[in-house]
Amino acid sequence: MPMLNAQQFLNQFSLEAPLDESLYPIIRDICQEVKVHGDKALKMYNLTFDHTKTDHLEISHEQIKAAFDTLDEKTKQALQQSYERIKAYQESIKQTNQQLEESVECYEIYHPLESVGIYVPGGKASYPSTVLMTATLAQVAGVENIVVVTPPQPNGVSQEVLAACYITQVDQVFQVGGAQSIAALTYGTETIPKVDKIVGPGNQFVAYAKKYLFGQVGIDQIAGPTEIALIIDETADLDAIVYDVFAQAEHDELARTYAISEDAQVLKDLESRIAKALPNVDRYDIVSKSIANQHYLIHASNFDEACHVMNTIAPEHASIQTVNPQPYIEKVKYVGALFIGHYSPEVIGDYVAGPSHVLPTNRTARFTNGLSVNDFLTRNTVIHLSKDTFEQIADSAQHIAHVEALYNHQQSILIRQS
């Protein structure tokens, strides 16, 4: 972990393409197979990729309710608190139709999407938080049909995931994962309904399938490895910062972590504490590789330079742990989510804070945002002009149409003026 000054870091900073282009033919073939053969293809891929035989793709409502009913009380309460906070936050930011004066002639109205598919990762871990951070938003938006897909497991889908589906009132849950599940949600099969939009994180196969099928179905984003950048000073609790770094690193060997400070000694102390804690860290194989290859210590000469580095990285998660964090809130502009102070660690945002943890990665925070309830709404503009308003603006409209040589456009105006 060599320390770099800000300019050295910026000179070498680059992000590799988040997706492996060699996967394209594989994804194309999987999608075509699902499009043609439907459920038969899904069951074949469950056996091939997930080593699980699935006679029935859909998990019954009785199984979903039983998972909730038999869940231990502490887990049930934790999931419920997370749900309530997410729901309250999303309700507070939801775009709503306003009561307008009759004189208002141009305005917007919002409608919930009809159907949404949610991808919940599986594999070695269970992610009920992904259900909460996506399905709750769709529920608050008023989406009519919420469908969850998640990879099958030999011992069945995680009970915690099913319990989260029960809490968020998901309509259907299917045990199918990977690119094949994205294709199923896009095209529809005998049992899985076609949806209007697909959200939720996944591996490269899932991300590439979403990219490949975008246009036939809406998507939230093309997600890459997780990342965090922290701006810290001498007042930061470095032992806590160590675990803020490890928390991101344990997700993925490609997870990126950045520590930025105007105080070089703070960075040296952090490096020493990371080195001391690393040998005994949980998930050592993953964390150690991430730290070795994707961890950066960046010495900024002043406040403006620290903010410039942060905005250039445009990380999924940004954490400000300094004596006076307030100035950073206005200056740090391009991040997925901004966590301020010692008691707002990024991990609290993963689970219970309220905003969704589905956030832009790979510098896409420079032009897009984290998932919210409003991503499950359509926005329609309404134009309802009076005769007086039409007469005031018609000449300009027909003249612009004439300039563009679109004479039928022009005639559409002129015929109303006559």
Curated annotation (Swiss-Prot):
Entry binding sites for NAD(+): 119, 180, 203
GO cellular component, one term: cytosol
Residues where Zn(2+) binds: 248, 251, 350, 409
Entry binding sites for substrate: 226, 248, 251, 317, 350, 404, 409
Active site, renumbered: 316 (proton acceptor), 317 (proton acceptor)
Cofactor: Zn(2+)
Pathway: Amino-acid biosynthesis; L-histidine biosynthesis; L-histidine from 5-phospho-alpha-D-ribose 1-diphosphate: step 9/9
Keywords, comma-separated and alphabetical: Amino-acid biosynthesis, Histidine biosynthesis, Metal-binding, NAD, Oxidoreductase, Zinc
Cofactor binding notes: Binds 1 zinc ion per subunit.
GO molecular function, one term: NAD binding
Catalysed reactions, semicolon-separated: L-histidinol + 2 NAD(+) + H2O = L-histidine + 2 NADH + 3 H(+)
InterPro entries: Ald_DH/histidinol_DH, Histidinol_DH_CS, Histidinol_DH_monofunct, Hstdl_DH
Similarity annotation: Belongs to the histidinol dehydrogenase family.
UniProt protein name: Histidinol dehydrogenase
Organism: Staphylococcus aureus (strain COL)
